[in-house]
């Protein structure tokens, strides 16, 4: 039996992709770290606000509006979370 040990980054990535899929009603198989919320996943501004709020609750962090506007991709979210958790 083989066990895969997930790094913190892997766990964050997996959870963020699940959250994005749920909030944007997308199949998580189409979401990558390079996926852009508006251009690739067809999110609107309300979708992105709701997603940022869910991320804040899940990870116990604050994402000010001026920072949220800079978050364009799944990778941006993961990086933001990692920076706030370290």
UniProtKB/Swiss-Prot annotation:
Main location: cytoplasm
GO cellular component: cytosol; membrane
Protein family (similarity comment): Belongs to the acyl carrier protein (ACP) family.
Pathway as given in its UniProt record: Lipid metabolism; fatty acid biosynthesis
Stored InterPro entries: ACP, ACP-like_sf, PP-bd_ACP
Taxonomic lineage: Bacteria, Pseudomonadati, Pseudomonadota, Alphaproteobacteria, Rickettsiales
This protein's name: Acyl carrier protein
Subcellular location: Cytoplasm
Post-translational modification O-(pantetheine 4'-phosphoryl)serine, affected residues: 45
The record's account of how the chain is modified after translation: 4'-phosphopantetheine is transferred from CoA to a specific serine of apo-ACP by AcpS. This modification is essential for activity because fatty acids are bound in thioester linkage to the sulfhydryl of the prosthetic group.
Record's function text: Carrier of the growing fatty acid chain in fatty acid biosynthesis.
GO molecular function, one term: acyl carrier activity
Organism this protein belongs to: Rickettsia canadensis (strain McKiel)
Keywords: Cytoplasm, Fatty acid biosynthesis, Fatty acid metabolism, Lipid biosynthesis, Lipid metabolism, Phosphopantetheine, Phosphoprotein
């Amino acid at each position: 039996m083989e066990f895969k040990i997930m790094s913190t980054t892997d766990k964050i990535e997996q959870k963020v992709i699940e959250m994005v899929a749920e909030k944007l009603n997308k199949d998580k198989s189409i979401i990558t770290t390079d996926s852009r919320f508006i251009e690739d996943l067809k999110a609107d501004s309300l979708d992105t606000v709701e997603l940022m709020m869910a991320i804040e609750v899940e990870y116990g962090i604050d994402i000010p509006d001026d920072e949220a506007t800079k978050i364009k991709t799944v990778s941006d979210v993961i990086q933001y979370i990692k920076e706030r958790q370290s």
